[in-house]
Amino acid sequence: MGESIHGLERSHKCTELSSSNIGEKVTVMGWVQKQRNLGSLVFIDLRDRTGIVQLVFTDKDGEMFDKAKTIRSEYVIATVGTVAARSAEAVNKKMATGEIEIIASELRILSSSETPPMYIEENSDVNEQTRLKYRFLDLRRPDMQRNLILRHRVAKVARDYYDQNGFLEIETPILIKSTPEGARDYLVPSRVHPGKFFALPQSPQLYKQLLMVSGYDRYFQIAKCFRDEDLRADRQPEFTQIDIEMSFVNVDDVLEVNEGFVKKAFKEALGVDVETPFTRMPYAEAMERFGSDKPDIRFGMELVNMSDLVANCGFKVFTDAVAMGGSVRAINAKGCAKFSRKEIDALVDLVKTYKAKGMAWISISQENEIKSSFAKFMSEDEMKAILNRAQAEAGDLICFVADKNNVVFDALGQLRLEIARKLDILNPDEFKFLWVTEFPLFEYDEEDQRWAAKHHPFTSPMDEDLQYLDTDPGRVRAKAYDMVLNGVELGGGSIRIHIQELQAKMFKMLGFTEEDANRKFGFLLEAFKYGTPPHGGMAFGLDRLVMLMAKRNSIRDVIAFPKVQNASCPMSNAPDVVDETQIEELHISIAKE
């Protein structure tokens, strides 16, 4: 049994104490980081959310001294004592409280602890599975606490900023109608309505649009969202987004308001000045220059189109790609001619994982000796033209991919990032934002042989492209935009369709029958009959934003209790079986495997 806290009141958190408190009687409480027994003295490092302060117990204290000797790491204690200056040789400049210590006069052990399965310290070298199984211990570590405090600060900035800009925080339902948005819905069976199901929202999309129809003008919400999909480093089955919608706006209005939030968040939470307005880049330009719709613009190494130079050369791989309507493009990896054949082969293997058939290359040594995987098929003039366009110099490695455009862009876009990582030129302290705009409204689904929405069915076409809706859907651009930071999509949105007839037409183009559209979205189409303002908005992934601000590699590091790769929780063992009576009440049965 632990001792009672009765009669004690904490006067300070650990790092609220400094040399200005010397001579004061204080009461501190927290966890024992470590205990050191030096015979006539016992030192205890006491830890709370703010940091560590040193407690001192002497053998003159009798019973209290004996009690201090029994204390182990992670015991929870309360101590009353007097703040004193450390001796000059004992000052620890690495600690916020390194100039002081507390000479204890009272000690209570509030609860004891077993030996923890992991060290509770900064950057503890422990595998992630153990960290997640004992997440309640992992969250005691200073780096994890900093991450969650940063998350809190960003969320607070969001609430303050959007409130100051006339937005209302309105909660939308968690139990909704299933209208899958590309990923699978999490379904919730209804006990009251046998055979029917709610879904957990993938986003508040329809409800925030209905709030605009309802006249609320500016809405925001820090919303929980759910997607039943395979996980990656930046995906979770449940995630949090900062959700925004605005009435009577155009694209510029939405971008300006939301980059203002990001600027304020970085300044207030990190002390970092973010330059605004952000760079804006149409989707087509992003693909042409970087091979990606979320380019990392901290470095160059842009794609170069070589198609016209090689259309009639002797290298069949190049000529065939151009003849079938594809392209031949390259990147110049400056200073990479020193790559070994093994390293180049690894780059070839990389592009193959993105459906490229291979990678051609030219290397130029410091002595200007040219080596190439295809030089024997090229004339001297053709090779010279290629090198000129690539702005090649001694020491460079030029990497080529020839294929359909989408394969070329994807492969070279990923190759560009891999080479940047190998060269260690990605500065984690540099934050390069941009907006990617004018996305295609549709993308063609080869498997289903039909057009699908690039973003979602509620995105408005650009006015000047409406004429192509019936005749050339692939040419239609959307009033859509993504915010990108250092190659990571932070969020996205669009101006929405607000005309009922156009929304119905969009559903039809996407393959919905009138009956199906009405069953899934009838309440939205009905609302659009009663005066709908032009509106648009976006959503930020709060998890991703904080992950980048905290310079972490996984959003699991900025979520208190995340799921793992198979969408389970090692700590609580969720999901788990439930009682048979619960299953029966829901009027469902579990199929045998």
Curated annotation (Swiss-Prot):
Alphabetical keyword list: Aminoacyl-tRNA synthetase, ATP-binding, Cytoplasm, Ligase, Nucleotide-binding, Protein biosynthesis
Cellular component GO terms, alphabetical: cytoplasm
Predominant subcellular localization, coarse grouping: cytoplasm
A matching Pfam family: tRNA_anti-codon
Region (Aspartate): 205-208
Keyword set includes Cytoplasm: yes
Amino-acid positions noted as binding ATP in the UniProt annotation, renumbered to this chain: R227, D228, E229, Q236, E489, G541, L542, D543, R544
Intracellular or extracellular location(s): Cytoplasm
InterPro entries reported for this sequence: Aa-tRNA-synt_II, aa-tRNA-synth_II, aa-tRNA-synth_II/BPL/LPL, Asp-tRNA-ligase_1, Asp-tRNA-ligase_1_N, Asp/Asn-tRNA-synth_IIb, AspRS_core, GAD-like_sf
Entry EC number(s): 6.1.1.12
Residues bound to L-aspartate: E181, R227, H455, R496
GO MF annotations, alphabetized: aspartate-tRNA ligase activity; ATP binding; catalytic activity, acting on a protein; nucleic acid binding; transferase activity
Catalytic activities: tRNA(Asp) + L-aspartate + ATP = L-aspartyl-tRNA(Asp) + AMP + diphosphate
GO BP terms in the entry: aspartyl-tRNA aminoacylation
Broad enzyme group: ligase
Function: Catalyzes the attachment of L-aspartate to tRNA(Asp) in a two-step reaction: L-aspartate is first activated by ATP to form Asp-AMP and then transferred to the acceptor end of tRNA(Asp).
Subunit: Homodimer.
Membership in a protein family: Belongs to the class-II aminoacyl-tRNA synthetase family. Type 1 subfamily.
NCBIfam families in alphabetical order: aspS_bact, PRK00476.1
Name of this chain's protein: Aspartate--tRNA ligase
Source species of the chain: Ruminiclostridium cellulolyticum (strain ATCC 35319 / DSM 5812 / JCM 6584 / H10)
UniProt lineage: Bacteria, Bacillati, Bacillota, Clostridia, Eubacteriales
